[in-house]
C-alpha cells in the first residue's frame, strides 16, 4: 500500500 504496512501485493490502497 501507500502506507508503511506489510501487506500482500494485491492490496493496493
From Swiss-Prot:
User: Where does the UniProt annotation locate this protein?
Assistant: Secreted
Superkingdom as given in the UniProt entry: Eukaryota
In this chain, where does the modification Phenylalanine amide occur? 13
Q: Which UniProt keywords apply?
A: Amidation, Neuropeptide, Secreted
Q: Where are the transmembrane segments?
A: none
A single GO CC term for this protein reads: extracellular region
Keyword Secreted on entry:
yes
One biological-process term from Gene Ontology?
neuropeptide signaling pathway
Predominant localisation class: secreted
**Family label:** Belongs to the FARP (FMRFamide related peptide) family.
Give the protein name, as stated in the record. Answer: FMRFamide-like neuropeptide AF11
Question: What is the protein's species of origin?
Answer: Ascaris suum
